[in-house]
Amino acid sequence: MKTILLISLVVIFSGCALTKAQMAVTVHNPSSFDRNYEMAEIEWKEIQKKLNLQSGENIIITNSSNEQVPYQKVTNCDYSGENLIFLTSVAAGKEESYTILKGKPENFQPLVYGRLVPERKDDFTWENNRSAFRVYGPALKATGEISNGMDYWSKKTEDLIIDKWYENDLAKISSYHSDHGEGLDFYKVGRTLGLGMTAPFDNDTLCLGDNFVTAEIIDNGPLRITIKFTYDSYFAGSHAIKETRIISLDAYSLFNKVTNTFEADTTLLTVATGIVMPVDNPEEIAETTTFGNNSGIIAYETPEDKQNGTIFTAAIHPKGFNTIKVSDGHYVGINNYQPGDKYNYFAGGGWSKAGFEDFN
């Protein structure tokens, strides 16, 4: 992930009693590259305090051209409070100014969406304006199809397409496994971690859970969707494991933020974040199709599909990986883990037919 945008806050109170209090926000980009369509984040209680917000009052955020920008109140995922996020674009080494004040916000088109899909055996599928993802639920498990991994849907439209693709597929109008102009699902998951999920790693073996049991939407647009998934207990070697995943996707981002929590009857686990390599000889092709860096990156280029192109997949752990290797048909990044801790990282990908031509 990129370095964090720096935010400075200045509260402006006019001497005129009839003028609303305003909160001046400066977003600075200290990096050497432009940061376009990213999220700035501020504690909501800070805004409430500075603007003396009362119950039922709304705010607006304006840029330096006095245009409103979209925003969203989001949770901290641990229910410790709320933050405010808003879209910002800042050139390298520059800063942008915004103003927060009371007012009536414009209606902005949602850029993220997700839902449980009971009509497709309890899939849970979510998307932003660049990609879509899904995981598999209890109704599919009841048919005998078990998968603990994350699927990737390749999109070349900024439209939100989940409902349309499911409706057309179930009505046998058009399959979302074929490209009808907006993209398709041609990523292969099966009984694997799919794109960048994490599992206990015991005796050099991935220990996979089953399909999710419950799915709870925590944040629901227009800029961020966050879902909490719970799973039935399973074993990693002799240890009983209870797993929770919280997955969050922002507008414009290629990456989900993933927070895994594993409860276990031990003080230390080994865990592996993995990207499935759906080939017969993963060890032999790893040198030309993978990229790994112990500072925290694993990446894998899927085999080229002559009709549909290539998916470039990656997982990024901000604190790095102890070991990176091919194991159990996956490219994995391995770390020690203390049960009960939050294991935070990012997982996502890009599609060659949507302008993502290589890992650069």
Locations of the language-model features?
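Bacterial Sec-dependent N-terminal signal peptides
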Residues: 1-25
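Solvent-exposed N-terminal domain segments of exported/luminal and surface proteins
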Residues: 99, 104-205
